[in-house]
Amino acid sequence: MLTIGDSSPRISPMRQKTAAIVVIGNEILTGKSEDKNASFLITELHALGVALRRVVIIPDEVEVIAAAVRECSDGHDYVFTSGGVGPTHDDVTIEGVARAFGREVVRHPDLEAMLRGYFGDGIDAARLRMADTPQGSELIKAEAMRWPVLAMQNVYVLPGVPELFRKKFEAIRERFRAEPFHVHTIYTRQDEFDIASGLDSVAADHPQVEIGSYPTFTRDDYRVKITIESKEKSAVERARDKLLELLDSGSVVKVE
């Protein structure tokens, strides 16, 4: 199991909605395919005001999927899975999600009817397998989609194909909208070593704000990009103003 970003940044006193992404697929772990869904969802969730806390990449193994989904479901408001929902032998995400919640895998009559209507006489066992769902799961329908999104409690099961993943998420994205993040960015010509103590001081004095420092070695106009972020707009502005006091005024290229 590969986990990215398992540590949590400072949490604002304002309650944040949190999310985890579970990417499922041996092909991702072996380098046969490149995951594009997590990076897309990271950007989308942040724009919606949802704090991503965890990204997990795991193999196509039922028990591993069940354990990861259960853990992420317990610790986050939303969980999004990517991959493992096709008709072949290695598509075991549905079984893993069902096991995470102690449920059986059952054939959903609405999905079966949709599949039979779509494929007609071409329906077979492999295609009908796409109607299998964890018992008690929800089908989320939208006008923009032919096929619904499957949800099991706070877990949203999405396909691994990037085009389909995006379409399905975009159809349901507004249900996740939360209070937005407020971000200010300072670009400075000062070296990161020279501003480190000042950043530490401001971070300590403004615990409700997350401050990031990102040096660059390829730009001529600035050397460090500093981001100040929080759900609380006034807190961001106070931290920004304090940082501007500490930085050499002539070194600040721009503030966004």
Model-derived segments and spans:
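N-terminal small/polar loop signature for handling phosphorylated ligands or for N-terminal nucleophile
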Residues: S39-V92, G96-R99
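An accessory alpha-helical subdomain
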Residues: N154-L246
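Extreme N-terminal starter segment of soluble prokaryotic enzymes
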Residues: R15-A19
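Glycine-rich beta-strand-to-loop/alpha-helix junction loops that act as flexible
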Residues: I24-N26, T81-H89, G160, Y214, ...
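Proline/glycine-rich low-complexity loops and linkers
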Residues: V64-A67, D91-F176
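Glycine- and acidic-residue-enriched helix-capping/strand-helix junction motifs
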Residues: I28-A38
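Conserved short beta-strand edge segments in small beta-sheet-based binding/regulatory domains
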Residues: L246-E256
